[in-house]
């Protein structure tokens, strides 16, 4: 992150930086509908917590959602009162295409997985312009084939994708492009353009839908519902939607009524009406009653099944649609435009779509780095688009959810002691950034931290708001814990929130000026979170942490969320490393705040000292316990039994590299304004040298003095970076592997369990099996490593170099570190560290020729390039993310002009080939590629 001048003023930038009331109006409408609401914890009222079985895809068209709607290219107001989305039918499918289809864990060989082809093409932060592409097959959608074939496959097999079925062969599909453009903050235009890519004329039904989220059925008392009815506007059909007949939303301090809105359709559109109510007999069984004669699945029954009496002939209800059937010639297209605006709202006569699209071009031209290639600009823009499309109105009141509010179906009593029972305070009516709105349509705290770093490049206000919300009283637990994700809010994720707050603050400071109130309010709530971590996971008070799950789903031998048998505990290298990083970031925040309030100097001292205790504890645990293995030169988790015996888990994974992340530097000249902190610091350095020596060193360079605060000392740094830079260990052609490739030939075995290098999907179903940390490349952890290398470069004044290896000579069981100081003739002259008291002496290593080494910044730049190259096509048009040559998907994306510029941002990537795996729309943290392009392009 380098100092940059403020971004040039553009129309979109003006919308984002206007008066707060005007900015809020522009944000009122957006892509806030989920891609999937079925199968979520929010909609699960079962006794056993099996959300997938309780509300499957097959019931989604018939059952009213309680906590939020879904749809294709969905758009709604911020409280999801009035919703718009697109449904389609090709006259071949047995159901309307109202929502994206995917497999649940029991149907798939690697956990839940969407089986559709859609792409986020463009978006603006104000949502003044949005564009999405959905590829809709002309043949019958292969629902059963996808389920049957994936169910047949095992964990070692690749997933069977929609493209693999041959459904897109001969280009027999429609490219359906949905564009949304705002005339102003209150009026929306929707344009659907369907292109027939096939060789023959083909029919297509376009069914844009408008409906009210059901907020009126969850009380024992009758509540009047809102209404949608047919009207005529200048001879064209239209819908008048009015929510003033129903009570305002509960839980808000203001009235969120939308008032009367009109959705206008082109001539020739047929209007259909029903109610957003559950089809009782279909959902609950024969004899069950529906609250309305006209129910949620009416359009499916009318259009697909021909049931004319399924829809309301009175042309009124709480759900409506416009229906057009068209036949499109081969190579031709058809467009349909609609307008949604408050009743009587003035209309613009100019071409709003062209204006807004040009404004999007203008906005991103000011964002893209000047040295970025055309391909990098395409990658960055689609990553931003995916990030913005992934906003969602996340609605959940855990207190009501636990008790239930459907008077006809009270929830089972088991829920009182089950999932999230201790999170009754959590109450969200907020727009939140989702990891992936189909696969993960719920906020995940540590994912969100990375989202904000990317979001800050285009919308710092929203990024800061997201970070604050996780610390807001309606989210953060009174004990200080930050909620993890709805499957278990109490699970532990890596404590990266402080890092994200500090990074976003500085990005915003450079571009827009320091926002001290934001930093200060976050700092105070983060202190609560820090205290919670210390009290929760440092059971012996020795500053070595037992963090549990920590986000890396299957990286350990067993599920780290589970209690260990026999009273054993797992002392975790990554948990302790994360806490060291947390301490240092809090120290830096406190010093920043101390610029205007000296009281924060005492807090900076507290966090500095806590960092030292943590850093020293990793190397001076009681007895023979230590997380650092001097022989292997690596940090390992340690399994500790009540009888005092210890078993190191000799797994070379990210767990042992994460201690590198705990790195900051303090230049003496920085400390001059902070007299109290400087005195405390110097006293501690002098009088607690017994522990300071383990994790603080001092660098003298050209008369300047810098204190390097690093959990890893120089000896450990040598060993760890040698493995990071080794292609036979962590260095992949496409980034940083999550597990050393050495375990391909040398699996770690513990009892009946083992950990082996698996570069693709997981072969086991630990944590559901839909992600894998045993070999693949992940963006968030590599991003942090890149940042760590840059910090180390600055800390050691560019004197450190690391050898580059060709990956062909790999002595076992371990190698000496190949790491040199450029001032080798001075020994350690430039790095005058105190001697280490536990045998942490520098390993004698051969010095390779200079042409075979690089600086740490060079290694960071190389990692950034490798990560970006996952998405950059080679000379023949192949992107590594699409899989190896010869694979059906890779060939399609490489050679078909209607696919070649489209990008999926996968959850993680094959550690050997770079192929994208897991969730396919993880923008989400894979949008970090946009940050890498911003910082490292050219």
Positions of predicted regions on the chain:
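Acidic, mature catalytic/reactive cores of soluble proteins
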Residues: 2-55, 59-62, 72, 80, ...
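Structured, charged N-terminal subsegments at the starts of enzyme catalytic cores
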Residues: 71-75, 85-86
């Amino acid at each position: 992150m380098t100092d940059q001048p403020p971004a040039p003023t553009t129309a979109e930038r003006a919308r984002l930086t206007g008066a707060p009331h005007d900015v809020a109006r522009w944000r009122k409408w957006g892509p806030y509908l989920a891609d999937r609401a079925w199968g979520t914890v929010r909609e699960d009222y079962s006794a056993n917590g099996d959300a997938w079985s309780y509300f499957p895809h097959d019931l989604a068209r018939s059952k009213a959602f309680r906590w939020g709607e879904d749809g294709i290219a969905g758009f709604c107001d911020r409280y999801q009162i009035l919703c718009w989305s697109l449904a389609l039918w090709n006259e071949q499918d047995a159901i309307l295409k109202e929502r994206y289809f995917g497999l649940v864990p029991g149907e798939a060989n690697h956990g839940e997985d969407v089986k559709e082809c859609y792409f986020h093409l463009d978006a603006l932060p104000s949502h003044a312009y949005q564009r999405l592409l959905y590829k809709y097959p002309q043949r019958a959608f292969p629902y059963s084939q996808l389920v049957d074939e994936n169910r047949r496959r095992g964990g070692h097999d690749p997933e069977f994708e929609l493209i693999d079925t041959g459904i897109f062969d001969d280009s027999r599909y429609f490219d359906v492009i949905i564009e949304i453009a705002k005339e102003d903050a209150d009026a929306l235009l929707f344009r659907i353009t369907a292109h027939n890519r096939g060789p023959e004329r083909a029919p297509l039904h376009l069914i844009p839908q408008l409906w009210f989220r059901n907020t009126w059925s969850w009380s024992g008392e009758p509540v009047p519902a809102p209404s949608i009815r047919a009207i005529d506007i200048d001879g064209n059909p239209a819908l008048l939607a009015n929510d003033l007949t129903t009570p305002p939303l509960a839980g808000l301090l203001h009235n969120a009524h939308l008032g009367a809105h009109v959705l206008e359709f082109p001539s020739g559109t047929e209007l259909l009406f029903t109610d957003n109510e559950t089809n009782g007999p279909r959902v609950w069984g024969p004899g069950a009653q529906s609250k309305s004669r006209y129910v949620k699945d009416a359009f499916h029954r009318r259009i697909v099944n021909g049931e004319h009496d399924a829809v309301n002939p009175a042309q009124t209800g709480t759900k409506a649609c416009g229906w057009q059937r068209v036949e499109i010639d081969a190579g031709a297209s058809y467009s349909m435009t609609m307008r949604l605006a408050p009743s009587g709202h003035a209309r613009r006569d100019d071409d709003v779509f062209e204006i807004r699209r040009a404004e999007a071009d203008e906005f991103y031209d000011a964002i893209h780095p000047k040295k970025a290639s055309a391909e990098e600009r395409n990658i960055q823009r689609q990553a931003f688009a995916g990030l913005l499309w992934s906003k969602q109105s996340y609605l959940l009141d855990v207190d009501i959810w636990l008790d239930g509010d459907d008077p006809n179906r009270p929830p089972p009593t088991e829920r009182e002691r089950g999932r999230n029972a201790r999170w009754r305070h959590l109450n969200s009516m907020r727009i939140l950034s989702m990891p992936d709105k189909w696969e993960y349509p719920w906020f995940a705290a540590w994912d969100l931290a990375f989202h904000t770093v990317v979001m800050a490049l285009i919308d710092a206000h929203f990024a800061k708001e997201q970070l604050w919300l996780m610390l807001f009283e309606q989210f953060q637990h009174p004990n200080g814990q930050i909620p993890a994700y709805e499957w278990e809010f109490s699970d532990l994720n890596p404590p990266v929130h402080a890092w994200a707050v500090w990074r976003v603050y500085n990005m915003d400071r450079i571009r827009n000026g320091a926002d001290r109130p934001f930093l200060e309010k976050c700092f105070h709530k983060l202190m609560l979170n820090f205290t919670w971590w210390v009290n929760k996971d440092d059971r012996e008070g020795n500053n070595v942490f037992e963090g549990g799950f920590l986000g890396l789903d299957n990286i350990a031998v067993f599920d780290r969320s589970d209690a260990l048998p026999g009273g054993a505990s797992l002392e975790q290298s990554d948990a302790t490393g994360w806490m060291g990083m947390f301490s240092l970031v809090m120290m830096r925040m406190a010093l920043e705040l101390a610029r205007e309030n000296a009281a924060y100097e005492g807090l900076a001292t507290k966090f500095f000292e806590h960092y030292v205790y943590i850093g020293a504890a990793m190397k001076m645990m009681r007895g023979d316990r230590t997380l650092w293995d001097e022989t292997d030169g690596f940090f390992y988790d340690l399994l500790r039994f009540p009888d005092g015996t210890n078993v190191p888990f000799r797994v070379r994974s990210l767990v042992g590299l994460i201690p590198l992340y705990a790195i900051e530097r303090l230049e003496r000249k920085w400390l001059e304004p902070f007299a109290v902190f400087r005195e405390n610091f110097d006293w501690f350095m002098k009088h607690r040298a017994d522990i300071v020596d383990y994790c603080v060193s001092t660098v003298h360079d050209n008369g300047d003095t810098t204190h390097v605060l690093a959990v890893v000392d120089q000896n450990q740094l040598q060993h760890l970076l040698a493995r990071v830079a080794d292609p036979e260990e962590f260095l992949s052609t496409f980034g940083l592997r999550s597990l050393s490739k050495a375990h391909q030939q040398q699996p770690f075995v513990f009892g009946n369990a083992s950990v082996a290098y698996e570069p693709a999907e997981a072969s086991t179903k630990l944590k559901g099996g839909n992600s894998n940390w045993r070999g693949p490349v992940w963006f968030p952890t590599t991003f942090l490593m890149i940042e760590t290398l840059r910090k180390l470069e600055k800390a050691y004044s560019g004197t450190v170099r690391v050898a580059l290896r060709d990956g062909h000579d790999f002595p076992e069981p371990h190698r000496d570190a190949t790491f040199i100081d450029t001032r080798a003739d001075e020994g350690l002259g430039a790095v005058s560290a105190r001697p280490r008291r536990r045998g942490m002496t520098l390993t004698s290593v051969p010095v390779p020729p200079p042409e075979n080494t690089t600086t740490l910044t060079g290694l960071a730049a190389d990692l950034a390039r490798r990560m970006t190259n996952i998405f950059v096509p080679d000379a023949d048009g192949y992107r590594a993310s699409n899989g190896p040559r010869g694979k059906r998907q890779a060939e399609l994306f490489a050679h078909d002009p209607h696919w070649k510029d489209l990008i999926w941002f996968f959850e993680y990537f094959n550690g050997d080939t770079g192929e994208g795996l897991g969730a396919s729309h993880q923008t989400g943290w894979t949008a970090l590629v946009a940050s890498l392009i911003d910082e490292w392009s050219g």
